[in-house]
Regions:
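Short, conserved phosphate-binding/catalytic loop or strand-edge motifs used
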Residues: 286-292
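Aromatic-lined substrate-binding rim segments of carbohydrate-active enzymes
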Residues: 293-318
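Ser/Thr/Asn(+Pro)-rich, low-complexity disordered segments
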Residues: 275-276
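N-terminal accessory segment at the very beginning of proteins
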Residues: 1-250, 256-258, 263-265, 269-271, ...
């Protein structure tokens, strides 16, 4: 729904729409809604209209949320002023949006677990900072307050020796030997999914936590609040889907190196495993088995009979894995 339609209905900054809490200010719309149990999905855009994309999330059953919009009063410069604060509760998760648009998330015990980093002075730096780019979208920087003692785990597979990611900056992009999965768990009792496919960066600083997307039309993240990692992962899987069971061969012993140059070299290794009576599920011939880049056939100068090779491996109970 657009800003214009909201303005026709009410002058309030907040609106309860079906099972969601919505805030609008200037051209920005913020929408918070339940997405599975004990979780809240937060979206925002400066364009005045949110997309209908679910991205990595499944369209699962939404829990019934409790939404409250409260009027509050303060005296400033001798004048009584009215403002609104809104709340949405889904199981363990409670989000508050204050008069300045700052979002704070609490657990079921009322403990603060995540808070946007809004800086009103001196530059009025927003927590949700959208900067127009040349692609017709925005470069987005999302900033949160940081607990220096918090421990953070996850985010996929990186070539770093750190289990606790506190103090790390991670590139959110896939590379050879790097698989970026923008989901982390905190020892403060929550899981967080950055639900955007854009290339970007995540920084888990001691003074601030930041997520950056190089090009996007909106902000989108999911926060799951639970007491144990098991509960967090269970809700996370309900939200994004469950991985199928791997085939049996994939759970066996793999042999790989960088790389096998010829068919004879690979088969000599496979036959030696058989001679030693070591079960071999997969042997990976790896890259550059092809004649030219982009032509991913076997190079017959070095791999003269791939069919015969594959059949012999199959008789051994071994699969020939190759890249790509």
């Amino acid at each position: 729904m657009s800003i214009a339609k909201y303005n026709e209905v009410t002058m309030s900054l907040f609106k309860k729409e079906e099972n969601a809490l919505i805030r609008f200010f200037n051209s920005e719309i913020v929408k918070i809604e339940p997405w599975g149990k004990n979780s809240l999905r937060v979206r925002a855009t400066p364009d005045g209209r949110l997309s209908s994309k679910n991205r990595a999330l499944l369209d699962i059953n939404k829990e019934k949320a409790e939404i409250t919009i409260e009027k509050k009063y303060e005296v400033k410069d001798g004048e009584k002023r009215e403002h609104e604060t809104a709340y949405i509760v889904n199981g363990n998760a409670k989000a508050e949006i204050d008069k300045n648009g700052k979002i704070t998330v609490y657990n079921q015990r009322g403990e603060k677990i995540l808070e946007e980093a809004l800086r009103l002075q001196p530059l009025k730096t927003p927590a949700r900072f959208f900067k127009a780019n040349l692609l017709g979208n925005y470069q987005l920087t999302m900033s949160f307050e940081s607990d220096p003692d918090e421990r953070v785990f996850g985010m996929g597979q990186y070539q770093y020796p750190y289990l606790n990611l506190k103090g790390c900056t991670l590139e959110m992009a896939h590379r050879n030997s790097q698989a970026s999965v923008p989901f982390f768990m905190s020892d403060k009792g929550y899981g967080f999914l950055w639900n955007l496919p854009a290339i970007g960066e995540a920084t888990f600083g001691k003074n601030v936590t930041k997520f950056k997307a190089e090009s996007t039309s909106e902000l989108d993240y999911l926060i799951i609040v639970a007491d144990t990692p098991k509960e967090i992962i269970e809700t996370y899987m309900e939200a994004i889907g469950r991985s199928p069971m791997m085939p049996e061969y994939a759970m066996g012993f793999w042999q790989s190196k960088l790389r096998y140059r010829t068919q004879d070299e690979l088969m000599a290794v496979a036959r030696k495993y058989r001679e030693l009576k070591i079960p071999l599920s997969v042997i990976v011939c790896d890259f550059f088995h092809w004649p030219h880049q982009g032509d991913f056939r076997f190079d017959y100068d070095y791999w003269p009979n791939p069919k015969e090779m594959t059949e012999e491996l199959k008789e051994m109970g071994t699969i020939n894995g190759k890249q790509p």
